[in-house]
Amino acid sequence: MIDIILKNFENPDQIRNFEKGKFEIVELPNMTIGKATYKWGWKWSVDVSPLSGTDFCEVEPLGMVISGNATVDFKDGKIHTLKKGDLFYVSSKPHDSYVIGAEDYISLHFIGAEKYANWLIIKILYKKEKRLLEN
């Protein structure tokens, strides 16, 4: 039996890089934790939507903001601000998100990380394969 497992985002198990950001993954038994790092100007609908093929994010995260500020902008017009220290749950209702201010937005994702990471890689690989087949 293992007494302890130590991991660190300095050496993540996986990384999903995209324009103006990245999503790092650390895998533990029965749990996947994600770390989102988004730079100034990052916006889901601009930087991730083209990879995903959907206009809005539909992942349902539970997490904590480590630094910076971002908004969650629901398709129905409701807007919420996430700031350092906030614990957040965002429903799977279609939503956009973007960084506010010049500081990088960094958050940890305790629920939804595995789905987001897998969803990103599937969409990225599909787009690359589609481009190869078209050429």
Which residue stretches match the model-derived regions?
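Glycine- and acidic-residue-biased ligand/ion/polar-headgroup-sensing regions
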Residues: 51-76
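Conserved short histidine dyad/triad with adjacent acidic residue
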Residues: 35-56
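Glyoxalase I/VOC metalloenzyme domain signal
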Residues: 40-42, 111-126
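Short acidic-glycine-tyrosine-enriched beta hairpin
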Residues: 75-92
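A short, N-terminal "cap"/entry segment at the start of jelly-roll beta-barrel domains
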Residues: 1-37, 45, 123-126, 133
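Ligand-binding loop in jelly-roll beta-barrel domains
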Residues: 91-117
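Short beta-strand segments
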Residues: 34, 78-80, 106
